[in-house]
Regions:
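Beta-lactamase-like hydrolase cores
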Residues: 1-31
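Active-site-proximal loop and beta-strand segments within enzyme catalytic domains
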Residues: 14, 46-176
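Residue-level signal for well-ordered, solvent-exposed loop/turn and beta-edge residues enriched
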Residues: 34-35, 80
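Amphipathic coiled-coil signal-relay and dimerization helices
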Residues: 35-41
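Hydrophobic mid-domain F-helix/FG-region of cytochrome P450s
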Residues: 179-182
Length: 182
């Protein structure tokens, strides 16, 4: 990495903090296991004057999706994960999923003949959804299951998702969802 470019990045972040367009930041750049930049600047909590720290925790919401996707593709490159693998190969709970269809206002559940693959999770075609992606009976089940609360572990969260009905058969429809949470 070029030290001049790293200094420019640092100066740009400091300028954004000085202009109060950014309360604070933690910047980390690493390559091949070597950290070349790691700095904290600005405030973690402007109201309290709490300085940003290297260990500050951020709520990044859907920005985890590209991070998880890159990590998954690194595992694919290493031969430790195959995109065509069924999710059930790694998580048994995904072996017996059901897809929901609404008939005359009633939710009917049907077994899924072929489960979702890793590829389906990454491209949001696994049949999962969000509770706010509509107001139908499937979305209500997601809300009732409190999947947004994230009270449990990742394993518990995945188990909960596996037990909820799918909005579509895996591989058939794009539905922005909690798929990369799995």
């Amino acid at each position: 990495f070029c030290p001049v470019r790293l200094q420019r990045l640092s100066a740009a972040l400091q300028a954004e903090v000085a202009r109060q367009r950014l309360p604070g930041a933690v910047a980390l750049i690493a390559r091949r296991g070597q950290t070349v930049m790691f700095e904290s600047l600005g405030l973690q909590d402007p109201a309290k004057g709490t300085p940003m720290q290297a260990g500050s925790i951020f709520r990044v919401y859907s920005m985890t999706k590209p991070i998880v996707s890159v990590a998954a593709m690194m595992l694919v490159e290493q031969g430790r994960l195959q995109l065509a693998d069924p999710v059930a190969k790694y998580l048994d709970a995904f072996a017996k999923q059901q897809v929901g269809t609404v008939v005359d206002g009633t939710l009917e559940l049907h077994d899924v003949p072929q489960g979702a693959t890793i590829h389906d999770l990454l491209r949001h075609t696994a049949g999962l959804t969000y509770e706010f992606m509509g107001s139908g009976p499937i979305q209500r089940r997601y809300a009732q299951a409190r999947v947004a609360a994230r009270d449990g572990s990742n394993a518990e969260h995945s188990q909960t998702l596996a037990n909820l009905p799918l909005v579509a058969h895996p591989g058939s429809v794009f539905e922005y969802s909690r798929a990369t949470d799995v």
